[in-house]
Amino acid sequence: MASKTGSRRWMLQLIMQLGSVLLTRCPFWGCFSQLMLYAERAEARRKPDIPVPYLYFDMGAAVLCASFMSFGVKRRWFALGAALQLAISTYAAYVGGYVHYGDWLKVRMYSRTVAIIGGFLVLASGAGELYRRKPRSRSLQSTGQVFLGVYLVCVAYSLQHSKEDRLAYLNHLPGGELMVQLFFVLYGVLALAFLSGYYVTLAAQILAVLLPPVMLLIDGNVAYWHNTRRVEFWNQMKLLGESVGIFGAAVILATDG
């Protein structure tokens, strides 16, 4: 019995570490995909989301926070810094208005950003630490869970009100309209769990199972989004990387919630 308990705990710790790796490395992929995206835009004489002088500071801050989080040095503080950096850069891009996206794409982009910020707040609370020396901050974790709940509300909303998102699910998942409605209900129920703070671990476990097929079949079909929906290639790659980061946050809450 003791050996079974020990092996189960070891497996949970291993999965939790995997979630931490995926989430803490997310800013690296975000910076790389942004650089590639803005390089493509420069060839077409189009501006980046953030003016160039500030863009370098923004990416430098993101890489700095991600590096310290990855090495586990003051992870809580730098996770909080990463959340703040992402919030400021997203606000600057939104206010700047250099690039105009469709409403449905804005929801996809900003909802994922909100979820990643929530994941960093969960990490800043002390969740996902293998050897926790300080008590966990329940207020930070609750705030992060609310951000993840807001993301799920946006996804559920898009399934009902965005033609592009509905068609993506209809074209890539079996079951047709019934499957779309099933995902809508699942996203709604999971959102309620995260927003209310009840059954968070169970909700995170369900979300961790739900996200991989969605990432592989829908977000992972880059050619579909680029050719059919005119989403820039590296923008879709950035969204895919953020989905992986959200999966990492769900894994952390599922194993250490």
From Swiss-Prot:
Keyword Transmembrane: yes
GO-annotated cellular components: membrane
Membrane-topology annotation of the record: Multi-pass membrane protein
Localization: Membrane
Bilayer-crossing regions: 21-40, 52-72, 77-97, 110-130, 139-159, 182-202, 206-226, 233-253
Pfam families, per database record: TMEM101 (PF15111)
Keywords (A to Z) from UniProt: Membrane, Transmembrane, Transmembrane helix
Presence of the UniProt keyword Transmembrane helix in the record: yes
InterPro entries reported in the protein's UniProt record: TMEM101 (IPR029371)
Function text: May activate NF-kappa-B signaling pathways.
Protein name per its UniProtKB record: Transmembrane protein 101
Species the sequence originates in: Bos taurus (Bovine)
Lineage of source species: Eukaryota, Metazoa, Chordata, Craniata, Vertebrata
Gene giving rise to this polypeptide: TMEM101
